[in-house]
Amino acid sequence: MATKKIAQTVITEDKFYTIAAANGKVVEVKDYNTENGAQIQLWDNANAEWQQWSFVRAGEGVYRIKNRFTGKMMDLDCSGVTDGTHVHQWEGANASSQLWIVEPANDGRVKIKSNLAGKCLDLVNMNTENGAVLQIWADVNGDNQYWTINEVTRKPKTSATNFSGVFVVNAV
């Protein structure tokens, strides 16, 4: 079991984490969609499996970021490397578009950078509202490029139902 010290957070391969923006909203798979290409977005933390991620070691300091609910990896759309390339999920593959580096900051936050593009995980138009889309962008040292990785310590809410656009989460 490999671990790596990241600021004040220790990432362990067999644990799950939330990835939170500065406002506390977390990275999730939109509408708990299990399909390849499903959008990755920001949303209020509901302690749901589609908001939880594991970091699978893929080399020294390099990880694949895997969604707990879907089992799919955080991935660059069409293996893009330019500013504005959206981040989505895709089945695990030996693809450089699924490799990420976690760089600690001195304040407990981290930057998550694409190993392929060298660009930061970023919020489109610096939007921090529910539904904000994730992309990669050159490192501009903005708050929209810093993340807090928190270990999940509570049992997640796992069952979800969608009735006519109303999202219901049932505690297990």
Where are the predicted features?
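Surface-exposed turn/loop modules enriched in turn-prone residues
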Residues: 36-49, 84-93, 138-140
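Extracellular glycan-recognition/adhesion modules and their associated mucin-like linkers
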Residues: 2-34, 52-81, 99-128, 146-156, ...
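Intrinsically disordered, low-complexity repeat/linker tracts enriched for polar/charged residues
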Residues: 41, 51, 88, 98, ...
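Generic preference for hydrophobic/aromatic residues in regular secondary structure cores
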Residues: 19, 39-40, 65, 85-87, ...
